[in-house]
Amino acid sequence: EHIEQKKAIYERYKEGLKGLPVSMNPMDLENSEPNYWLSCLIIDKEAMCKQVRGEQDVCYVKESGKSCPTEILEAIASINAEGRPIWKPMHMQPIYRLNPFVVRDGNGRAKSNAYIAGDVADVGMDIFTRGLCLPSDNKMTVEQQDRIIEVIRACFE
């Protein structure tokens, strides 16, 4: 019953956010059976407004037709709903910051610099930058979830 409630939450988000430049949790339904623990989204790269996340502070610049996780989290917090950033990858944590980590092209240390041309090869950092966990409590009402969806849609206007 719990998994069915979580699945219904996920499906309502997926349907309600259709048409926005976002992707919901990717899953391989042929080879796995998801538990729908969290409903998460990732904003498409071209739909991201400018955002910088520090250790404790974050700032962003609102752009028409674009949004970022910080804007969405602030917007849903304004209606008393709680989301959160996707977990920060281990190699970005202060204690591990200087250690090597693996990316598609080998060691990722010193390849995630703003001055190096090209796409980010660090998939974990990219997901952290563009993703967020949506309110997913199974005690949330359909009306509350509809309001959250409405607020998220407004962030992209």
Model-identified regions with their sequence ranges:
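PLP-dependent aminotransferase class I/II
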Residues: E1-E157
